[in-house]
Every structure is written in C-alpha cells, then in structure tokens.
C-alpha cells in the first residue's frame, strides 16, 4: 500500500526557531514530529528566493540546473509531484495565488489558491486558510494522495493572531507567530491517519538577520 503524503512548507521559517534549545516559541506539535520522526539539522536552502529554493526541493537539483525562478517557472523540468501522479497519486494543493505556485500546481487533481499579492485582502491561517485545509482533510481525500501546502504567515510583514501575541508564546512577534503555526499543525495532524501518512515539513529559506519584525499598518483578516 502506498503511503499518503502531507507536505507542508512555510515561507521564511528559520531553523533555530524550531529545534534550537534557546527557542522561546511554544511548539508541542513540532516537538512531537521531531521526536517521532527524522529532523535534518544540516538541510541548507539553495537560495534566499522562494521559487529558486523550492524548485530545488521539488526536483533535487540546483537552481542553475532547473531554470526555475520565482517569476519564470520551467515546465520542462520534472518535479516529484509529476512523478507521483504518474504512479497513481491524487495531487492536492493549497497555495498562494503567485505565478510560480499556480504554474507548479496547474495539473494537480484539485487546487485551492488564496489571495496573497493584495495584502489588504490577504487571508492567513487564522483568517480562513486553516479552516479550509481542515475541511479538505475531513473530506477523506482519494488515496493515495499528496497534499502540498505553502503558507505565507511568517513572511514579513506578518500579522500575529491576537490570542498568540502574548509573551508566553515567545519573546518576539516572530516567535509568537511560530507558536500560532504550531497550533494549526496540531489541528491538521488530528485529521490525518499517521499510520499511513508521511508528514513532511520544510521551509523555502530562512529570514533576515536580524528578523525584519515590522508590524503591518492594517490587520483586516485576523482575530
């Protein structure tokens, strides 16, 4: 029997906020996955740009081999999404409405694209995307399946949900946002049969050093 694959990538997620002993974010679900799974502490991004770095993740090739950039998707390069589909997998995605992701997932079985470019309308996990993902998982996807999700919640400038914007969830707004993401990871895991599903979590790249912790002027899609 082929395993299902739940593949979640976070834009601008720093490794030290996940497994460093000095992290201040609260991440019981990430800690569980690290404890029960495999954690790669020396995985290094091939680029600081989303399209280039994820192009490498999806093809196991360097950017100068893929020809994939954030603004120029090379459809002639095979990704493992295509390979898995050829092997009978049903392909699902929840991605931002950016050209790179739309072209990447154009031939998926089903795809949900959320607003990102118009920042004043941008919905994040707490603004509806999280519930949409849970609803899709609750529908019991046709097996075997791979469900790819890319989340922009950590991409600056980001909105911290009010219930997580507290010191107990981290010293900085970034740390608190990671705590919020972990909460949603827990909700997703509740809908997944871990006995027959491979769960993969990654970032595209890290973030600025120091972190660009600038609070947006508006916060319409938050609670």
Name what the model sees in each region.
Residues 1-223:
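Catalytic domains that recognize anionic headgroups
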